Structure formats: structure tokens, C-alpha cells
Amino acid sequence: GVSNEEIAEILVQLMKQAVGDRPFIISGGDVGSSVARYMASQSPQALLGLHLTDVGIIRPLLKKTHSLSLEEADYQERAQTFFETETGYMEIQATKPQTLSFGISDSPVGLLAWLGEKYWAWSGKDQNGDSLLSPEDMIHLVYLYWETNCAATAANVYLENATKLLPLANLTVATGISL
């Protein structure tokens, strides 16, 4: 398998083949956010800019107990709740991805259960607490994984990142973030 850092190296080379020496802009969200940051860290001269839709959890802030602004305290509470209720998938995918992979690669219902639960939990909600993603939208998103047979590979990235990932350097590329 490959880590986000290794994926970044591959994508930079592919982009250089596609656009030559012309700098390009990248955008990433979720795991792609980490990949995009590694691309910017490894090859800043190749980029005009970086757009992120996810910056991850700011882990040091979770441990801070004093001098928090209202915004930081709110972030800390929401991030802590997320860690306590929504990160079990990370532990499974980072330690036993192959066990999971059989169920999500062999059964469309297994894949829908695994991914659909996350899409439902993480999507915005209306006033009634219903997901802003329709059931059809969720099925379409899951179908992309099913049709391309990439769910096992996507799960395995967490194991690779848990064992191979190096810390990111400070970024010098112009960066925009939309949350």
C-alpha cells in the first residue's frame, strides 16, 4: 500500500507529465486534504496554490485546558465529541484493514452499511435531524466505491499512514480553506 505522502509524490509526477513545468492549483478534502498538503510541502515550486476543505483535528488544542477563546472552546468540545463517537473506523482501518476489506469488497450491502453510516453521521442535518444528503445521493456516493472496487484500497491507506507518515513541513504555498 501507499501512504498520503507517497500518493502526493505520485500525483505531483502525474501533474508534471500533464502540464509540464507550468504551476498548477490543487484542492483536497478528507484524506485528499492531507495528500494535497504533502504535495505542497514536497513541491511548492510546482504549485500556484492550495485549496483545502478539511484541515483535520488540531490535536494540541484538544489537550489545552486554559486561556481558550469561546471559538476555541467550542471547537475543542465538538472535536472531543467527534473523537469519542466517530473515529472507531480509523482504528479499524489503521489496524485491521484487510479484515474489513473482505466485507466491503464482497457485499454491496456491507459497503453501503460501512460508508453510508459515515455519510449520514457527518453530513449536515436539517431542523428535524435528517441528513441533507438524500438516500439517492448516499447510494450514488457508495456506488462510486463499488463500481471502481476501491473501498479496500481506501481503507488500507489508514494503515499505511499509521506506520509511514512523516510530519508535514510548514507550507509556503498560498493556501485557502473552506470549511
Which role fits each region the language model picked out?
Residues V2-A18:
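Alpha/beta-hydrolase active-site loop
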Residues E5-E9, I25, G29, S33, ...:
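Conserved structured core elements
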Residues I7, T65-P97, P167-N170:
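The feature captures the conserved acid-bearing segment of alpha/beta-hydrolase catalytic domains
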Residues V12-Q13, R22-I26, A46-H51, F102, ...:
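Beta-sheet entry/capping signal
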Residues Q13-Q17, Y38, W114:
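Residue-level signal for well-ordered alpha-helical scaffold segments within enzymatic catalytic domains
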Residues M15-K16, A40, K164-L168:
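Short, flexible, glycine/charge-rich loop motifs used to bind or transfer phosphoryl groups or to couple energy/partner
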Residues A18-R78:
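Conserved hydrolase catalytic core segment
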Residues Q93-L179:
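C-terminal subdomain of alpha/beta-hydrolase-fold enzymes, centered on the catalytic histidine
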